[in-house]
Amino acid sequence: MIAVIGLLLGFLVSALFLIQGKRRRTNDNQEKKRSSSEPVEDVVRPKSYSKSEVAVHNKRNDCWIIIKDKVYDITSYVEEHPGGDAILDHAGDDSTDGFFGPQHATRVFDMIEDFYIGELH
């Protein structure tokens, strides 16, 4: 008799947890649907820079470059650059050709995104 009551009690507790979990998932799904249908107010758009704005950032301690019409602030990377001061050859200017040169490992294509600050207009 005690075993039957124990099994029944275990079944009821399990059922309660299952019902609560389903209810929580349903609420989460409803919240996702609501939030995806609401207009997004805080869309972050990339900043836009002119070539002349980028051009003033042409020093070791203030170094921006352009790669395929995207602007990158690489100031914090200049001292780490394995190619030394070659990175400064196009500081404040378009560095697309140099960036895609044979001297760069493919990992630079992932790394560069960490320095992205906007688009060229």
From Swiss-Prot:
Pfam families: Cyt-b5
Skewed-composition ranges (Basic and acidic residues): 26-36
Membrane-spanning residues: 1-21
SMART domains (UniProt xref): Cyt-b5
Annotated heme binding sites: 81, 104
Record region (Disordered): 24-49
Keywords: Heme, Iron, Membrane, Metal-binding, Transmembrane, Transmembrane helix
Cellular compartment(s): Membrane
Entries under InterPro entries matching the protein: Cyt_B5-like_heme/steroid-bd (IPR001199), Cyt_B5-like_heme/steroid_sf (IPR036400), Cyt_B5_heme-BS (IPR018506), Cytochrome_b5 (IPR050668)
Record keyword Transmembrane helix present: yes
GO MF entries: heme binding; metal ion binding
Gene Ontology CC: one annotated term: membrane
Ranges of residues in domain Cytochrome b5 heme-binding: 46-121
Predominant place of localization: membrane
Membrane topology, as annotated: Single-pass membrane protein
Family: Belongs to the cytochrome b5 family.
Protein name, entry field: Cytochrome B5-like protein
Primary gene name: CB5LP
